[in-house]
Amino acid sequence: MRISILQLVPVVGYIGFALGELYKPKNSISCSPNNPCPAEWPCCSPYNECGAGPICVGGCNVRSSFDEESCAPIPALVASQKLEFVSTPKVPKFIVNYQPKPPIREGNGPNKANTKVGVVEGELNSKRIIHYAKFLVTPDSKEAEKMLEDFDFTHSGYTSIEASSGNIVLAMPKKTTGSLITSTRSFLYGKASVRMKTARSRGVVTAFDLTSAIGDEIDFEWLGGDLMTAQSNYYSQGHLDYTRMQRFPVGADTWATYHTYEIDWDPDRIIWYVDGKIARTVLKKDTWDPISKEYRYPQTPMRLEIAVWPGGSETNGPGTINWAGGLIDWENSPDIIEKGQFTAHVEQITVTPYQNKFTEQVQFCIKAKKKAPTFSQKDLSRVVVSYNRQDRLNHHDEGSLKWDCFVTPKINDWLSSWKRSK
């Protein structure tokens, strides 16, 4: 369910003072294509709330923001790059690994929220993970360029690195709204693979999804009260259709056992894999909506997200609580008693973008601006994509995209937007 990541995770994990008060209004302002953000808080987040600063980076929804230049261009992951996290001492990095489109085939107590540089934040930074409120928020172009080279993921909430394994731990201490990691770059078609163990207990939800700034999404989700099953769904342009959700067996306890989950997405189909076996396939041709005369199929650049969130929170609506399996027992659940928190553990992440119709355009842009016949991985780190928002209410697809190179999409400070920072 899309509410999982879009409405809960971003508000967690502030200590000392409320970071959110500095880049969001005191009283929340909702945004939509019919009700865009005001000039003073110009950027609409993926959670349909207006703000500035880090809200204008990555997942900023141009359709619901103040104007077309409020959101910063989105850092892109393009063919010949590969984003990877591994739990060994190896440092993750972009790797040359061009792949054409493939054919269809058959603990010791809770951590503090990580908003200050310290031991936990330093460990995350060493794994190329940075707090989302810091990423690309700087007036210094050189510092922003270095962030693009140095960091592959952002985090919020109670994220840490497990000392014994090097795994990413996504934690949800008692009465909090969990943790989230997000890739710093978005890609248009490719394969995303995550090897992980999910959180357990009634009402606790673990999610791995691909999501775009304007509401395209492909999901895996796991309910903590049903550890033998995974759920899948997909959405287009923010149109939530829960009838498309399908469940399938995993084969072994998802909390006790590491499994590899993959989403393979191209212009014609989506395939969900569990441990190398196809669990579900959706063909674009089967998503045609005769009423809107559109394909309800994800076809805009998406970033990877992994989260733990409280579907069974008493603050949620009854539909969400029932879907999640009921209210969370914040006092007597085994992991709360033993560790003070629910946790999911991520051992490996790999994102490999496929070649798409814009690949040659991107390469031409780099060569033309460099005035050279070749390009480097560093050159690719400054490729960006944005949306041509001529009409807020129009359906967006590949034709809505604008690609550019040698662009550093920084935001000067927590009160700025892309327009104010250029």
From Swiss-Prot:
Induction: Expression is increased in low copper conditions, probably through the transcription regulation by the copper regulon transcription factor MAC1.
Subcellular location per the Swiss-Prot or TrEMBL entry: Spore wall
Signal sequence, renumbered to the chain: 1-20
UniProt superkingdom: Eukaryota
A GO cellular component entry from the record: fungal-type cell wall
Tagged with keyword Secreted: no
GO MF terms held by the record: glycosyltransferase activity; hydrolase activity, acting on carbon-nitrogen (but not peptide) bonds; hydrolase activity, hydrolyzing O-glycosyl compounds
Limits of the GH16 domain: 67-339
Family recorded in the similarity comment: Belongs to the glycosyl hydrolase 16 family. CRR1 subfamily.
Record-given protein name: Probable glycosidase CRR1
Species name: Saccharomyces cerevisiae (strain ATCC 204508 / S288c) (Baker's yeast)
Gene: CRR1
